[in-house]
From Swiss-Prot:
Heterotrimer of an alpha, a beta and a gamma subunit. It is an enzyme of class 7 (translocase). Its EC number is 7.2.4.2. The gene is oadB1. Keywords: Cell membrane, Ion transport, Membrane, Sodium, Sodium transport, Translocase, Transmembrane, Transmembrane helix, Transport. The chain crosses the membrane at residues 13-35, 42-64, 125-147, 160-182, 214-236, 266-288, 308-327, 339-361, 413-432. GO terms for biological process: sodium ion transport. Catalyzes the decarboxylation of oxaloacetate coupled to Na(+) translocation. The lineage of its organism: Bacteria, Pseudomonadati, Pseudomonadota, Gammaproteobacteria, Enterobacterales. It comes from Salmonella typhi. This is Oxaloacetate decarboxylase beta chain 1. Its cofactor is Na(+).
Amino acid sequence: MESLNALLQGMGLMHLGAGQAIMLLVSLLLLWLAIAKKFEPLLLLPIGFGGLLSNIPEAGMALTALESLLAHHDAGQLAVIAAKLNCAPDVHAIKEALALALPSVQNQMENLAVDMGYTPGVLALFYKVAIGSGVAPLVIFMGVGAMTDFGPLLANPRTLLLGAAAQFGIFATVLGALTLNYFGLIAFTLPQAAAIGIIGGADGPTAIYLSGKLAPELLGAIAVAAYSYMALVPLIQPPIMRALTSEKERKIRMVQLRTVSKREKILFPVVLLLLVALLLPDAAPLLGMFCFGNLMRESGVVERLSDTVQNGLINIVTIFLGLSVGAKLVADKFLQPQTLGILLLGVIAFGIGTAAGVLMAKLLNLCSKNKINPLIGSAGVSAVPMAARVSNKVGLESDAQNFLLMHAMGPNVAGVIGSAIAAGVMLKYVLAM
């Protein structure tokens, strides 16, 4: 009987909590959205599978060595950790003390747990290497740069303003999160509000990079919200675009884009990086990788490197990035009131960014002979190239011969630049406080 009892107690099913069961269902939902509905499958599939692995009871695949120690509830070991942190020797008190401790102290406690015989789970290791270091989002940004054509933006520089206007959704959402906190509805700190706000940029790697720096405890919810809403751009944007434009405005035909020279395309990423990085060094990591990837593409002298970055490298990193985000889909981190706030603020951020881009296009038309179709303003959110395709689709509904795709790629690419700069602004001023 003892052997049978030990066997039963060793089964993960016997230790399955309500929170873990809910998160397993959430992870299955993400897999269904990725496979059946094709919602951002490149990220949602590994994120969903990472969520499954993270919530298997007793497996500990997403736990660090210290978290494994705390889950083991050994009184003697807890007493040693508590003595180092000057707190009560119980799990709750130790977690609170760790949350307030300096990173150096947290690392010291992690090393102490390793010395006691605990090892981090494989997903925790993935997270430390891929996101904790900030490497994975930066490599993906390099790949995105290698796949980006700045031609439409250079051919019509005014569209840079549309991309900039769309970033208004980011800062409006930061204010929204702080407002929720002010009225006591949902508690958000300033770093958490900044990390949530970047969802409005519709740029997954930037959202992961910034939340990993400012609010790693919210990374899972922020990443899921960012990629889910990016997939829902064809549903979120059109009603806003139609509401803010007249039939006449939607029929505006834009002049043919000029041909952009090879020299312009080579110089642009270098000049862009120097201008922005010298003024805002905190934006240099994201924008630097983006511009480097684009320079490899446009220079034409490193085609092998450019091809590797666009295909093999970005695919490999995407796998580990998704699994690493899935490591944060654990019940005690995800099933919080803050998650609902993140999902609500995320969709509001998309809406405000879309509206701001459209309204900026209408404003530019007041002082310009060459009219801009306001529909391309919505492409200022950096969901590349989906937002540009949505602008083209809505335009074709009003005029079947009015093709806006290439025009919309200008603000779409500008949105990528804008979201990277916005992330740099957040890092500079939030971390300085």
